[in-house]
Design a protein with these regions (language model features):
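Intrinsically disordered, low-complexity polar/charged tails and linkers
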Residues: 1-166, 172-174, 181-206
């Protein structure tokens, strides 16, 4: 998990003194947004060859892949532009970066500001509660929400109903939150970390 390249922190945290009398511990003080996937739909057909001439760091080989690939440096982002007018943005690390990346594509078809409003579809965040976790106990206590098969995958999968996100929980205390297949906001990622904290404290290894 250390190879994830975490580079953005968030100061929100939960003090365990607020969680049923546990000793004072700060969980997920420095969780990070690792990747955001968003889309733009400009609702018009795009001539990808013409667009490639307008944009730097663009690649288009229709025999290999049906989209134009564009790499942006500031903010760091990779975009896939399809003929249908759909644009997929990946690699940003905040909602602000998503909006900034979307503005880079206003040159396509003389777009208006409203045409580049991005929709976030998936957000991946990583946190560390700083203590080891009894995954077997967590799985037993919350069997209706969890999948734990250590012979296949070392982490426990926790499917949270509200907010609707998936958490990958590891014995080391590392937790990955992803909003796969749903429209997710950063505030929901924060809520997920808050809601999972008391469960992890109850299954803390001693």
């Amino acid at each position: 998990m250390d190879s994830l390249g975490l580079n953005r922190t968030n100061s929100d945290f939960i003090s365990s003194g607020q969680l049923g009398g546990h000793e004072e511990v700060s969980c997920f003080r420095d969780y990070t947004i690792h990747n955001i996937v968003a889309t733009i739909n400009i609702n018009k057909t795009v001539n990808l060859e013409d667009v490639m001439k307008k944009l730097r760091n663009a690649e288009y080989n229709p025999k290999r892949f049906g989209a134009l690939i564009v790499r942006i440096r500031d903010p760091r982002c990779t975009a896939l532009i399809f003929k249908s007018g759909k644009i997929v943005l990946a690699g940003t690390k905040s909602e602000e970066e998503v909006k900034l990346a979307a503005k880079k594509f206003k040159c396509i078809g003389n777009l208006k500001q409203d045409d580049t409003t991005p929709r976030i579809h998936n957000m991946v965040a990583v946190g560390d509660c700083k203590f080891p976790i009894r995954l077997e106990g967590l799985s037993i206590d919350h069997i209706e929400f969890t999948t734990y098969e250590p012979e296949l995958f070392s982490g426990l999968i926790y499917r949270m109903s509200e907010p609707k996100v998936v958490l990958l929980i590891f014995v080391s205390g590392k937790v990955v939150v992803t909003g796969a297949t749903v429209l997710v906001k950063q505030s929901e990622i924060e809520d997920a970390f808050k809601k999972i904290t008391p469960l992890l404290l109850n299954c803390r290894k001693v």
